[in-house]
Amino acid sequence: MKNVANLEGEVYKTTNRIIQRQRMKDELNILFPEVAKQYETDLDNHIIYTHDEASTPVLKQYCMAVSLYPLLTEGVGNIDGVTPSEPNDLQSFSGQITNLIFLLSSQCKGAVAVGEYFIALNYYVVKEFGDKWYEKLDCEASSPHCLIKRTVRDNILKAFKQFVWGVNQPAGNRSYQSPFTNISYYDHTYFTSLFGEFCYPDGSKPEWIAIDTLQRMFMKWFNQIRLKQVLTFPVETFAMVHNGDDIIDLNYKQLCAEMYAEGHSFFTYISDSADSLASCCRLRNELAENTFSPTSGLTGVMTGSCNVITLNINRIVQDWALTHTLNGTPLIKGKKLIDNPLRVTVIENDLKNYVTRILERVYKYHIAFKTMLYDLEDKGMFAASNGGYIHISKLYSTIGINGLNEAARFLGMKVSNNPEYIEFLQLILGTIKEQNKLHSIHDRKRPFLFNSEVVPAEGLGGKNYKWDKEDGYVVPEDENLYNSYFYNAHDNTSILDKFILHGHQTYQYTDGGSAAHINLEDHLSKEQYLKLIDFAIANGTNYFTFNIPNSKCEDCGKIIKRPIDTCPCCGSHNITQYTRVIGYLRPTKAFGSDRQQEARNRIYSDGKSQV
């Protein structure tokens, strides 16, 4: 929705970028003077891209998954300086957690994940309706003097509404965008691992049956409410643990497939142990420790990214290729290779060394940025740190990846489930993961930890394509932007091949997550989703979601959770399609022109015939 609030956010972008770059160059001149000038050169040459560089003139972390324990003990008063106390009932909790998300989102550029939402919510449900409240869901819980009679269930649903309507409100401090909000569901195995030692401020512990009831209630309710209003947030992640053969908590496996079949949309994260956690739509946190601290409430859910710098792999690979000859003849810039004549996986050390030299500079850029964040934190400038919700030390510095498919196609490879392409993915992803570990600094006071992700690139995918084409590099003629998947979104790659491409062969080389987005033309049956969960376990596909476009009739307001041309209620053709680039649901007409063109070319698979 265009208005003066988001126009205001656009006006100062050029100024913001100038300020941010100068600040970085000043810090690099102090810490790493040998790369201070190179930073701007790398940006101007589109070798790298610093995300949200122009969104704000001040330093902010990128995204965060926070602990809610300080909210339970102190409330948001330790941030806003206004709220007099911690929440004392269900209604005040719902109000304060919404306020918290807005307060935290004002101090970061991206998402805020509240992985403990249902754990915290249960604390106040118990306070209000007593132990074993889940046995009293249909009992009336309102005074005889109340005109509106509400049951325990009604009061919980009211709390859901307050939270969801709240986080979908536009925020003035974010150019009239809603705060990007994430929540998580945990199966019994995950719950036991993450929260087995967790204690509420009053010394009590959360019961699994209570958390299970809240999670199921919310999923069912949220799925139904999206038939009345297309809601973007919260983005949901459904976490389960498997034993190598099957999901251990079979009840949650059934629930997962059931909710997909009923048309709900969420991410699924499966792991062979509860030692990692997908907190945002892309971030995977390998839990170094998972012990409960009664002073901080730490349960292993605190993580995030302080900065994202993305490598343009297509340009990097082409620059590398131009340093070689083919049969004694220099390569010509802008000419695509046929059948991988450079045999890139045979001379892999050469490309690996080339990428590593770039990475060594990028790590210095990241250290400079995070050092400035540490300095601001020491001065008390981050309310999230002051309040104990997240600390800069918990945040990763992220190496983003874009243009992988396009680089492979330049080299003459076919982007599909074939050994040559998979080896190329392993080479690039593996090099970055290896260097991330080698360059991470595990300092107790000021650690510098690195991870990687295949970035969503909602805007960057089109920018990199445009910049590379203008500068004479090879770009695919059947695309208009760079992909964010390990397959081509515009071809008919089978569903199973998509799972395989995002499976163990590649996933073991990523340390920040890369969700497989399976674009389908319609919803599958529960039995088919169960088969795909089994297939994901067998192939090590840890992180996936299913994307079926939604449709809304602009004349009568009817919402259908599949693509349609004609409204079944009023016959209107005035239909708005909603889909996901990566992560969150948006109307296609709100995309940039390049994304709208890509959306028209994207293939949505006939899953019913493939599974």
Show where each model-derived region lies.
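Conserved catalytic cores of very large enzyme subunits
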Residues: 2-393, 414, 418, 422-568, ...
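Core of folded catalytic or high-affinity ligand/protein-binding domains
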Residues: 392-393, 397-400, 595-596
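Contiguous, well-ordered alpha-helical segments that form the cores/surfaces of helical PPI scaffolds
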Residues: 397-410, 430, 580
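Long, charge-rich boundary regions
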Residues: 561, 569-611
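Mature N-terminal, pre-catalytic/accessory segment of carbohydrate-active enzymes
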Residues: 1-2, 7, 15, 583, ...
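Glycine-centered flexibility sites
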Residues: 400-403, 512, 583, 594
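Glycine-rich phosphate/pyrophosphate-binding loops
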Residues: 411-420, 589-597
